[in-house]
Design a protein with these regions (language model features):
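An N-terminal, well-structured beta->alpha segment
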Residues: 1-66, 70-71, 147-171
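Ferredoxin-reductase
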Residues: 41-119
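Active-site flanking residues adjacent to catalytic metal/cofactor-binding acidic residues
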Residues: 10, 51, 101, 175-178, ...
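Gly/Ser/Thr-enriched, mixed-charge loops and adjacent short helices
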Residues: 111-201
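Alpha-helix N-cap/helix-start motif
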Residues: 25, 57-61, 109, 124-125, ...
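Residue-level detector of short coil/turn "hinge" positions at structural boundaries
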Residues: 14, 75, 97, 142, ...
Length: 201
C-alpha cells in the first residue's frame, strides 16, 4: 500500500500505517534504488541511510533498505541521525546518494523519506515525479546489494561541528528540542563549543 499523494515536490511523507505499509516502503526503496542506479550509471551505488527518533522509524528504515538492496545498492547505515548529518555523511564517506527516514516537523504518526543523489542536493520536483512513476508502476531493476553499519558516525558528526565552531565568550544556551532527534545532538555540540547548556526537554 502506498498513497500517490505522499510524493511531494521535494520529499515524500505519509501517515503510517494508514497511507503506506512496510511493503509500500520497500517498493519506495526499489524505486529509489532504480533511480539512483540510472542517474549514477553504477551497478552498485553506495547509499547513506539514516533515521529519526520516531518509535517506528527503524522498521520503516529496514523496509526501505530491503528495497534498496534488492536493486543492487550498497547501504551504509549511520543509524539515528539528523537530516543535515546524512548530507554531511555523503561528503564525508563519499557516497553516491542519501535516504533519510523522517517526516521532519510533522507530528507523530507521520513518516517519510528525504532523498538526494548529487552531493548537497535533495530531490527536485522532476526527480520526485520520476521516482513516483518508477515506484507506482513497478519499473524496478534487480540486483544484489549489501549493507553495513557505520557505528560511530554520531561522534564523527559532533566532533566536526565542535572543532570548527569554538566560541571565545561563554554563553548560556537554553535548549528545548521538543522531544525531537536534535535532543540527542544539540546539547553535546553546544557544550563542546563552549556553551553552558540548560536542557528543557
Amino acid at each position: 500500500k502506498i498513497d500517490p499523494f505522499g510524493f511531494r515536490e521535494y520529499d515524500a511523507r505519509w501517515l503510517y500505517p494508514e497511507n503506506i505499509n512496510l511493503e509500500g516502503v520497500a517498493n519506495l526503496g526499489k524505486g529509489l534504488g532504480t533511480q539512483v542506479i540510472k542517474h549514477t550509471n553504477k551497478k552498485n551505488p553506495r547509499i547513506i541511510v539514516g533515521h529519526d527518533y520516531r518509535s517506528y522509524s527503524e522498521e520503516i528504515k529496514a523496509a526501505l533498505k530491503k528495497g534498496l538492496i534488492s536493486t543492487g545498492c550498497y547501504i551504509e547505515d549511520i543509524g539515528l541521525s539528523l537530516s543535515p548529518m546524512v548530507y554531511f555523511a555523503q561528503f564525508n564517506l563519499d557516497s553516491d546518494a542519501v535516504a533519510m527516514v523522517t517526516a521532519s516537523h510533522n507530528e507523530n504518526g507521520w513518516t517519510g523519506v528525504k532523498m538526494g543523489i548529487k552531493k548537497g542536493l535533495t530531490h527536485a520536483p522532476e526527480e520526485m515525479q520520476e521516482l513516483k512513476d518508477i515506484t507506482l508502476n513497478s519499473k524496478f531493476v534487480e540486483g544484489e546489494g549489501s549493507e553495513k553499519e557505520i557505528s560511530n558516525f554520531q561522534s564523527i558528526y559532533k566532533d566536526d561541528l565542535i572543532n570548527k565552531n569554538k566560541i571565545q565568550k561563554k554563553i548560556k544556551a537554553v535548549v528545548a528540542c521538543g522531544n525531537g532527534t536534535a535532543g540527542i545532538f544539540a546539547p553535546d555540540i553546544l557544550r563542546g563549543i563552549g556553551c553552558e547548556v540548560i536542557e528543557l526537554d
